[in-house]
């Protein structure tokens, strides 16, 4: 039985997340997903969705066999417990595969690190891009609403 581990924040689920997990699942028999803890996310803005909700959403996805929250103190602890054969990285994850491979070996974790290619057939494959688009549309709509209200009041 080949165990695959995928990791990530999974904030505001989008087609890129699903692609990453589907491609990861194809590499083995079981897909374990480690969802990053809110407190451990330092390389990008804090998630919009709390960790417990992100965990529930990821666990509900078809390719996922098991989903767990990461460890608050030791990122390798869940990996040691799962004992994966393969660890996948998403196309935009900040880990360097070779550096991660060496760190795993130092922890006596014998897993192959595989980078999953980018999913490009969807315009929204980044949570950050989705948040930007929501902010842009909200701004446009509020301006449109203000202009309409001004016209109705005879101010324009």
Swiss-Prot record:
ATP binds at residues 9-10, 14-17, 92, 119. Pathway: Cofactor biosynthesis; FAD biosynthesis; FAD from FMN: step 1/1. One of its GO terms (biological process) is FMN metabolic process. Its cofactor is a divalent metal cation. Its EC number is 2.7.7.2. One of its GO terms (molecular function) is ATP binding. It holds the Pfam family CTP_transf_like. Keywords: ATP-binding, FAD, Flavoprotein, FMN, Nucleotide-binding, Nucleotidyltransferase, Transferase. InterPro entries: Archaeal_FAD_synthase, Cyt_trans-like, FAD_synth_RibL, Rossmann-like_a/b/a_fold. Homodimer. Catalyzes the transfer of the AMP portion of ATP to flavin mononucleotide (FMN) to produce flavin adenine dinucleotide (FAD) coenzyme. This is FAD synthase. The lineage of its organism: Archaea, Methanobacteriati, Methanobacteriota, Stenosarchaea group, Methanomicrobia. The gene is ribL.
